[in-house]
Design a protein with these regions (language model features):
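Long, contiguous all-alpha helical interaction modules
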Residues: 102-353
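Domain-exit/linker segments immediately C-terminal to small folded modules
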Residues: 2-174
Length: 353
């Protein structure tokens, strides 16, 4: 097989005795639909589907595990990136069994999608290899799936083939994946802190609005996960407490004026303030202002050494990621009204796409 007729180095050769195995190999792969958000908040067309290729050591044992994939509901066959597809496949195969009983040592994930220079083909656009995935990595991903699972969005589409006096509309169920789970899976598969790079999900107002869907799941995630450092957990709790006081004050002021509390504007102000920080000095100034607006903070009073340790450490991006994680996972005063406003705008944009 030669992928490019003009480039000899792209020629692939295999001995005849492997023909039968190669012929049936696609039947042992796992396939996922990808929904990956770009930084502008729109779906990335370069990664639309993923093929998970297992590295099989025992075909009979793997065949038993593969049955779990075959009976998986369609809602679980969508992923948010390479690592998410790979770990989702492994979680599906493993179920309650030990990793040693799967008959595989690892797997490769290949993505396919559209590229600007070729509208007619769906070429390979990315790949990643997984070897010897640790049980604790899969345990963390299992928690991420539990808290940030796929959701089903029902869309109305016009049916050009419809006749008569009917509306000519059909209902389409679309499985929408979690961008946050995609980030978490990339981090834990690479041995990084699960929240690292969280600021990438807040680079634009549109992207931040989409992340609003993850609030309930993120709150559950930060509450249930075993943190690597207790100072990280205390820092997020301090952020939650500061937001709770700020939203409570806004609600009280709005009630006196008989107005709607501007929770959405305050959320955007906090987001842009944290995202404007480009070095340790500006971030510390922003966090100092953030906490000063948060009134009396019991977490700061009791655990100020741990919170301060996060703020003054050399890795200032870590403090920003944790602060934005706290903002995204806040669940308390004003969150119901804020959630309705953010989700209403995000749902309309999803339906347009």
């Amino acid at each position: 097989v030669q992928r490019h007729s003009e480039i000899a180095s792209t020629c692939l050769e295999e001995p005849p005795e492997r023909y039968l195995c190669l012929h049936f190999a696609p039947m042992a792969c796992l396939y996922y639909r990808l929904s990956l958000l770009a930084r502008d908040g729109k779906w990335d067309k370069r990664k639309r589907a993923a093929v998970v290729i297992p590295h099989i050591t025992n075909l009979r044992t793997y065949a038993d595990a593969f049955q779990r994939y075959l009976v998986s509901p369609m809602g679980r066959l969508s992923a948010s990136g390479l690592a998410d597809a790979g770990l989702s496949a492994l979680l599906c195969l493993k179920a309650e069994e030990s990793m040693d009983t799967l008959g595989i040592t690892g797997f490769s994930v290949i993505t396919y999608g559209k590229v600007p220079w070729d509208k007619n083909q769906t070429p390979r656009t990315g790949s990643i290899d997984f070897q010897d995935v640790r049980p604790e990595t899969l345990d963390r991903f299992s928690l991420a799936w539990k808290c940030l699972g796929n959701r089903t969005l029902i869309l109305q589409q016009k049916d050009p083939a419809a006749k008569g006096n009917g509306k000519g509309e059909t209902l389409l169920a679309r499985s929408v994946t979690s961008p946050v789970r995609g980030l978490i899976s990339e981090n834990i598969s690479a041995g990084k802190p699960w929240y690292q790079g969280f600021s990438a999900l807040f680079t634009s107002k549109e992207l931040a609005r989409r992340i609003s869907y993850e609030r309930e799941g993120l709150f559950a995630m930060v509450s249930e996960i075993v943190w690597d450092l207790s100072s990280e957990e205390k820092f997020v709790e301090a952020i939650h407490q500061a937001i709770r006081f700020r939203f409570g004050k806004l609600a009280s002021q709005a009630k006196e004026r008989n107005e709607r509390p501007p929770f959405d504007r305050e959320f955007e102000r906090m987001r842009t303030g944290l995202m404007r920080a480009k070095n340790a000095q500006t971030l510390r100034a922003e966090l100092a202002d953030f906490f000063s607006r948060g009134g009396i903070n019991p977490v700061l009073q009791e655990d100020w050494r741990q919170v301060l340790g996060i703020m003054v450490q050399p890795d200032w991006q870590k403090a920003r990621d944790l602060a934005l994680l706290g903002l995204a996972s806040y669940k308390g005063k004003g969150v119901t009204e804020l959630q309705k406003e953010l989700e209403a705008e995000t749902t309309s944009s999803e339906e347009e796409e």
